[in-house]
């Protein structure tokens, strides 16, 4: 379940419950900005009830320390991505390669196939 942000989380949690009730094996909630304006109680309840397996959000906004302690919470580190964008701007070059990860994916696949750690 993907959305641009989690404010209270009501809509995403409702979708998670519905898809689990319809037979989904797992439910992952993914968002760019996790604000969690109503706290984590409802997320805790849904996790404990088995409606959500993970909540994944970027570290592009402040994340309360309590979020990092949740067993279902994963912070997607965007530091390197932001650094690449800033570097591209500072050198007046296109950010196309930053936005299109195809070359990086192919490079990782080649390393994987060759048994090279990455």
Describe these PLM feature segments.
Residues 1-118:
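PRPP-associated nucleotide enzymes
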């Amino acid at each position: 379940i993907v959305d641009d942000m989690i404010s209270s989380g009501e809509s995403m949690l409702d979708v998670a419950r519905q898809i689990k009730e319809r037979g989904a094996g797992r439910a992952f909630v993914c968002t760019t900005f996790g604000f969690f304006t109503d706290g984590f109680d409802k997320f805790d309840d849904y996790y404990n009830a088995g409606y959500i397996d993970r909540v994944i959000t970027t570290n592009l906004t402040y994340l309360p320390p309590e979020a990092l302690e949740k067993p279902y919470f994963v912070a997607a580190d965007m530091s390197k991505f932001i650094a690449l964008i800033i570097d591209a701007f500072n050198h007046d070059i296109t950010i196309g390669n930053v936005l299109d990860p195809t070359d990086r994916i192919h490079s990782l696949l080649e390393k994987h196939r060759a048994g090279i750690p990455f």
